[in-house]
């Protein structure tokens, strides 16, 4: 028995050691603040104040990442943005970068971008040091809602960035309607997707319209196999054929299996902080 023990146990220990050293997905958590803010069309300074108030709350709750809605600076489908939007990098994105550095938070936010004579519905990801990590230009721009419409981005802007929290991607609202774009995201194997939304409908359609957003976020989380944070706003559309439609909040967070982790308030502002499970596999 002793001879068997001395011969077999070392081999067993070596085998166990090899097994435990095999490559495996690393499990971690990231603390995300979902910043469902009020956005008023054209109110750049007021919107920046509301962004900073949300960041203060996120910082107090020790968040790692703060997420914001689509067109958080000037409002979505606002034709005045053709004159007042800034380039990226530029004054607006620089202010976001300064806030990220001030509060020590990574920020994902939607903001309009002027590039020459074109206006883009864009979103940026900025790290806690204020470095611009990525810019995405919306592809599914709904051109019937503004004249002239937003310019369409390139599909190559759908990408992921390696960060301290894993591979993070950003797309915008109606981009998630497209199976083609969703499949491209899936091929990139993200660890976390952050999606600014401008989810608007007529007053009589709320709160039922929240369920549509929930179903959309859940369906994409299942395809992407990672947590998805869909951040909506509160407010009202004031231009174009959808004038008077309400942004009703109801931001949605789902895990990589499509389980709903949070739905934010109906037609009210809220900053909610959640610990999201991130499974960082070998890519």
Residue ranges and their predicted role:
Residues 24-28:
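Boundary at the C-terminal end of the N-terminal hydrophobic targeting segment
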Residues 10-21:
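Bacterial N-terminal signal peptides
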Residues 1-7:
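N-terminal secretory signal peptides that target proteins for export/translocation
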Residues 29-39:
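Short beta-strand segments enriched in small/hydrophobic residues
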């Amino acid at each position: 028995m002793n001879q068997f023990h001395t011969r077999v146990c070392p081999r067993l220990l070596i085998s166990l050691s090899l097994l435990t050293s095999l490559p495996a997905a690393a499990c971690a958590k990231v603390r995300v603040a979902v910043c469902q803010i009020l956005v008023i069309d054209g109110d750049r300074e007021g919107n920046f104040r509301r962004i900073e108030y949300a960041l203060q709350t996120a910082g107090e709750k020790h968040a790692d990442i703060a997420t914001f809605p689509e067109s958080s600076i000037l409002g979505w489908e606002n034709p005045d943005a053709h004159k007042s939007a800034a380039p990226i990098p530029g004054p607006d994105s620089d202010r976001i970068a300064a806030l990220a550095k001030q509060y020590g938070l990574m920020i994902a936010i939607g903001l309009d971008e002027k590039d020459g004579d074109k206006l883009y519905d864009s979103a940026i990801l900025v790290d806690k040091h204020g470095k611009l990590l990525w810019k995405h230009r919306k592809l599914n721009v709904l051109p019937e809602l503004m004249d002239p419409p937003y310019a369409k981005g390139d599909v190559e802007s759908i990408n992921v960035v390696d960060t301290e929290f894993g591979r993070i991607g950003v797309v915008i609202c109606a981009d998630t309607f497209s199976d083609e774009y969703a499949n491209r995201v899936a091929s990139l194997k993200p660890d976390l997707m952050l999606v600014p939304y401008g989810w608007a409908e007529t007053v009589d359609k709320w709160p039922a319209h929240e369920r549509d957003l929930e179903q959309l976020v859940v369906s994409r989380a299942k395809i992407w196999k990672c947590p998805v944070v869909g951040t909506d706003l509160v407010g009202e559309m004031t231009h174009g054929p959808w004038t008077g439609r309400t942004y009703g909040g109801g931001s949605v967070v789902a895990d990589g299996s499509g389980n709903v982790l949070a739905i934010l308030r109906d037609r009210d502002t809220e900053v909610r902080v959640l610990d999201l499970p991130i499974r960082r596999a070998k890519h």
